[in-house]
Amino acid sequence: MICPRKKRPIKDEDFSAIVVPSMRGHGYLDYTVESHPSKALQNMDELRHHEMLCDLVLHVTYKDKIVDFKVHKLVLAASSPYFKAMFTSNFKECHASEVTLRDVCPQVISRLIDFAYTSRITVGETCVLHVLLTAMRYQMEEVAKACCDFLMKNLEPSNVIGISRFAEEIGCTDLHLRTREYINTHFNEVTKEEEFFSLSHCQLLELISQDSLKVLCESEVYKACIDWVRWDAESRAQYFHALLNAVHIYALPPTFLKRQLQSCPILSKANSCKDFLSKIFHEMALRKPLPPTPHRGTQLIYIAGGYKQHSLDTLEAFDPHKNVWLKLGSMMSPCSGLGACVLFGLLYTVGGRNLSLQNNTESGSLSCYNPMTNQWTQLAPLNTPRNRVGVGVIDGSIYAVGGSHASTHHNSVERYDPETNRWTFVAPMSVARLGAGVAACGGCLYVVGGFDGDNRWNTVERYQPDTNTWQHVAPMNTVRSGLGVVCMDNYLYAVGGYDGQTQLKTMERYNITRDVWEPMASMNHCRSAHGVSVYQCKIFVLGGFNQGGFLSSVECYCPASNVWTLVTDMPVGRSGMGVAVTMEPCPGILPEEEEEVDEEM
C-alpha cells in the first residue's frame, strides 16, 4: 500500500497548528551573525571577479593608457561619499553604465576598489603618496588616514620636507601639522639633508621665524641660513639680510659671532650684513643692555640631584604653564651640593658630593645633559673637588666658584672652556666661600655671601674676566650662606639662606648702578640650600631645608608686584639640588606625566 505524500505547507493556512513562542506573545528573536558583513562583502567581491551583476564600467585614463574596471555602484557608493553623490544626486552618471575617471593611476584605483570590496589595502612605501592623493580625491577617509598614519610613523630628516610640502598642497591638515612639528623638533638634522636646500627663501624665512623651533643654540639657525645661501650663493646672496632679520641675533654667543665676522666667506661678500652683525657684536662687547630675545621652543625648569636622607640621582623638569613635573634620565651618580647652569642649550652639573650611609665623597665631576636626546655625558673633571660650589656662565665659559673638599674651604675659582674641554684656574677670591650665591650680570660674575668654615659672610665680590681681577662691592644687609642668587633686569636678588642661627625667608636686591642693597618682599617659607632660577621674568624658588625638615614647596616672585606666591610642590622634598632653565626635552623622549606625590615628613 502506498501512502500519499503530504503536500509541503507554503502558506499560513496550510499549517495545522500555530506555535506561539509565549503565552502572552511578547517574546521576540534577536539574532546577529558577526561574520555576515564580511561574508557579504566577500560574495560581492566574488561576483565582481566573475563580472556578475556588475552595473558599472569605470574607464580609468592615465597618460595614453585606458584600463577598465567592472564594479557595482552600490559598493562604490557605500565606500566613498564622492561616488555616493555621483550615483544618487541626479548627475548624469546616476543612470550611466559607464563612467570615465581621468588623470588617475589605474594601479591606485585598483587598490581602492579592492579596499571597497575587502576593507583591506596593502601599499608599498613608494606608492603611499599616490594612494593618499587619490583617496582624498574620492573621499575615502579610512584609506587616507591609514596613509597619513604610515607617513607619520616613517618621517625622517631626509623626507620630512617633501612630505610636508605635499601635505600642504593637497590640504591634508593633520599630516602637515605633524611634519611641521617634526621639522621644528629635528631642525638641526633636517638642515643637513638635500631637501632642505630645495626650500625657497620664503619657505625658509617662514620656517626660521617660528619660535617653536627646538634648537640648543641660536647658532644652529644662523648656520642653517649660511649653508642654504652657500648652496647657490650667486642667486641666494640677495636674501641673506632678510634671513638674518629672522635669526635671534642677540641670542648668538659673542664668541661665535666674533668668529663669523672674522672668517665667514658669505659675510665677507655681504657688506650690509657684516655691518649689521658688527654693530650688534660691539654692543655685546661693550656690555650694553641688549633687547630681550624670545626663546625658541618651550622652556622648563630643571632640577638635578639634591639631598634627602641621602644624595639623589634624579633629574626632573617643571613646566610652570602646565603645572606638570617630568621625570627624565637619571644622573650618572647621586649628587647633592652641586651647581647647575645652561650653556648653548645644554644643562651642566658641576661638583657636589655623594653622601649616604655608605659613602661621603666630594665630587669634581662635570656632566652634561642634552634635552634633545635625554642623555648624559661625562666631561673633564674640575682640578679640585668642590662641594656646595657656586656656578655661573660668562661669554661661553663656565665658572666654578669656591666650595669645599673635606675640611678645606676654597677661595679658588676655575673656568671651563667647552671647546677644549679643559678647566683652568683664574684669580682667587679674597676669602673662601662655601654655599655662596653666584650669578652673572653685565659680563661680570658676582659672588654673594657664603661660609669659610668659621665665618658667614654678607660681603660681595665681583669678578672681571677681561682683567682677571676681583673687587668688593656693597655688602648685603644680612649675613647669608646657603642662599640663592639670580640676576634680573640689572638687579641681583639674594633669596633666603642661613645666618648662623636660623633659616631665612627674607630677600634683598642689589642695584648694580647705585651699588646699594634694599630689602624686598619675604618668601612664605624660611629656607636655605634651595634652588633658585629666573623663568619668564619671575623668580622661582624650589625646595630647601629649614627647622621643619626638607621642603617640597615652590614659590614664585613677581618683581612688578613685589609679591611671593606659592605655586606647587615638588614630587619629593629636598635640598642642595642644581637648578637651571633650558628647552623642554623632545617629544619622542618625554615620559608620561606623573602624578605628584606628597613629601615624606
From Swiss-Prot:
Its main location: cytoplasm. GO terms for molecular function: ubiquitin-like ligase-substrate adaptor activity. Kelch repeats lie at residues 292-337, 338-388, 389-435, 436-482, 484-529, 530-576. Ubiquitin ligase activity of the BCR(KEAP1) complex is inhibited by oxidative stress and electrophile metabolites such as sulforaphane. Electrophile metabolites react with reactive cysteine residues in keap1 and trigger non-enzymatic covalent modifications of these cysteine residues, leading to inactivate the ubiquitin ligase activity of the BCR(KEAP1) complex. One of its GO terms (biological process) is cellular response to prostaglandin stimulus. The record marks 127, 264 as: Sensor for electrophilic agents. Changing residue 264 to S: Abolishes repression of nfe2l2/nrf2-dependent gene expression. This is Kelch-like ECH-associated protein 1A. SMART domains: BACK, BTB, Kelch. It holds the Pfam family BACK. Pathway: Protein modification; protein ubiquitination. The gene is keap1a. InterPro entries: BACK, BTB-kelch_protein, BTB/POZ_dom, KEAP1_BACK, KEAP1_BTB_POZ_dom, Kelch-typ_b-propeller, Kelch_1, SKP1/BTB/POZ_sf. Homodimer and heterodimer; heterodimerizes with keap1b. Component of the BCR(KEAP1) E3 ubiquitin ligase complex, at least composed of 2 molecules of cul3, 2 molecules of keap1 (keap1a and/or keap1b), and rbx1. Interacts with nfe2l2/nrf2; the interaction is direct.
